[in-house]
């Protein structure tokens, strides 16, 4: 390898065949060998409860479930590739994150175990486009929602988040390549509002419905920040919000201060 995190460089130079995917390779090999554990050494510091570039005094994350780690990776935790968790989960192989620059530092264990902490970490995903489709009643409600899914599928544009009612649908996407085509087709069925320069903020943890109170803590932290969308993840492992990018740093600090202060951690 000529540089860190690059593999399979041709003998005559040229572009590498794989860059930044060594954690995916490690978990794939570990799954194939049915390893007892996969250790991922990175030059990044330990996994924090929030990105230390934007937040003062983030806590360290010592343990995550596979689902929680996957959600964090999807929503922007740079220490993990979103695809590296699936092979380990398939074979139930724990993944340990270690710091190559400080080998004696505490590590983070990712496994199928859930600990007692409800809130684990906060992640943010930038370059989001928020779109609201308000039905003009040309279609009945179930056909209206179906039509939106069909058009996004037609133009191969994945949805990061979706919230719907019988009269309107709000979505968040990170790929605007075919957005003009999508809007053009859906304008005959809906009034369309588009806002760019948005951010998804995701609070990740063990958020089973019977654990009352965490929603109130989250909303209290964000009481002064306008929210475009609120979405509960289908896996019960995250609550996500869409906000303006200019509010990102303030939102992350407010959540970190509210959710990871000592008295809250002791109660959870």
Please state what every model-predicted region is.
Residues 1-11:
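Single conserved hydrophobic/aromatic residue that forms the stacking wall/gate
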Residues 2, 90, 103, 124-126, ...:
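A generic structural signal for short, non-catalytic loop/turn and secondary-structure boundary residues
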Residues 3-4, 25, 83, 147, ...:
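Generic structural microfeature
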Residues 10-87, 93-98, 104-124:
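Active-site phosphate/oxyanion-binding loops
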Residues 44-45, 102, 166, 236:
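Conserved beta-strand edge residues that scaffold enzyme active sites
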Residues 108-268:
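A conserved regulatory-domain signal marking ACT and ACT-like small-molecule sensing domains
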